[in-house]
């Protein structure tokens, strides 16, 4: 079984954790941006089927 020879330093742990958090942050920003563009109808890359409300009235 593979076992690390030495302990990982606190600074290296912090750097890796911050990189991991930053990836999650940017994924959330992109998702929010896409949701905003879909809700306003300005999205050019995401198609949403429009349903008519005439059947409900």
From Swiss-Prot:
BP term (GO), one: translation
Keywords assigned by UniProt, alphabetized: Chloroplast, Plastid, Ribonucleoprotein, Ribosomal protein
Superkingdom of this protein's organism: Eukaryota
One GO MF term attached to the UniProt entry: structural constituent of ribosome
Entry keyword Plastid: yes
The protein's name in its UniProt record: Large ribosomal subunit protein bL32c
Subcellular location: Plastid, Chloroplast
Source organism of the structure: Liriodendron tulipifera (Tuliptree)
Spans traversing the lipid bilayer: none
Primary location group: plastid
GO cellular component: a single term: chloroplast
């Amino acid at each position: 079984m593979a076992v690390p020879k030495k302990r990982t330093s606190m600074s290296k742990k912090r750097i890796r954790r911050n990189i991991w958090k930053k990836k999650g942050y940017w994924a959330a920003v992109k998702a929010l941006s896409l949701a905003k563009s879909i809700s306003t109808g300005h999205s050019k890359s995401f198609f949403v089927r429009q349903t008519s409300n005439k059947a409900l009235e």
